[in-house]
C-alpha cells in the first residue's frame, strides 16, 4: 500500500463530502470470485455539475436500473476508464495482486488526472497520488458507486458474450461464479481457455482430465 493511502472505516457523511471534493476518481472491481474471465475494474470521475440520481452499490441495483445508470454515467461523467487483468495474469500473480494491477490500469486510463483516488474495500494499490480505501465505499461514495456500476455492467456483458460461445456452461446466469450449475458444466464439458486455472475447482478438474 502506498504511503499516500489511508484506509477509512465507518466513514461519516461529513467525511464523504470532504474527500469527494475536487477531481476525485472512484474505483471498484467486479469479478474476484468467478472461476473464469477477467477481473474488471473501473475508475470514474463524476461531473459535480451533472449529478446522477440513484447511484448505489451495483449489487443492490436491478439489472435494468444498472444499465440505465451505466448510460447516464457514460454520458455525464468527466472521465471513465476500465482496467482489467486476464485469467493468465490472475494465475501468475494471484487474484489480489491482479485486482490491484487492474485498478492501476483503470486509473492510468483516465483522460483527466485526479487529485485523489477513492477505492472500495480495505486495500489500495500504489497510484502515485493521494488515495483512500473506504470500506463499503460502493454504497457510500457516488464516484465509487459509479465505478462499481461500470465494472459490473462491463463484466456481465462479457459473460453474456462467453455464454453465446459456450451456451452449455450457463454463463449468462451465473456470470462465471462457482455455482452448482458451473461445477456441473465443468464436470461435463471440461475447462475452457478463459478459466482461471489456479482456482481450486478448475485446478481439480484439470487434474482429473489429466488422470484419465
Swiss-Prot record:
Note on how the cofactor is bound: Manganese or magnesium. Binds 1 divalent metal ion per monomer in the absence of substrate. May bind a second metal ion after substrate binding.
GO cellular component: cytoplasm; ribonuclease H2 complex
Major localisation: cytoplasm
Subcellular localization, as worded in the UniProt entry: Cytoplasm
Domain of life of the organism encoding this protein: Bacteria
Binding positions for a divalent metal cation per the UniProt entry: 28-29, 120
Annotated GO biological process: DNA replication, removal of RNA primer; mismatch repair
Pfam families from the UniProt entry: RNase_HII
Cofactor(s) needed: Mn(2+); Mg(2+)
Tagged with keyword rRNA-binding: no
Gene Ontology MF terms in the entry: manganese ion binding; RNA binding; RNA-DNA hybrid ribonuclease activity
Enzyme Commission code(s) on record: 3.1.26.4
Keywords assigned by UniProt, alphabetized: Cytoplasm, Endonuclease, Hydrolase, Manganese, Metal-binding, Nuclease
KW tRNA processing (keyword) present: no
Family from the record: Belongs to the RNase HII family.
Protein name: Ribonuclease HII
Lineage, broadest ranks: Bacteria, Pseudomonadati, Pseudomonadota, Gammaproteobacteria, Alteromonadales
Gene name in the database record: rnhB
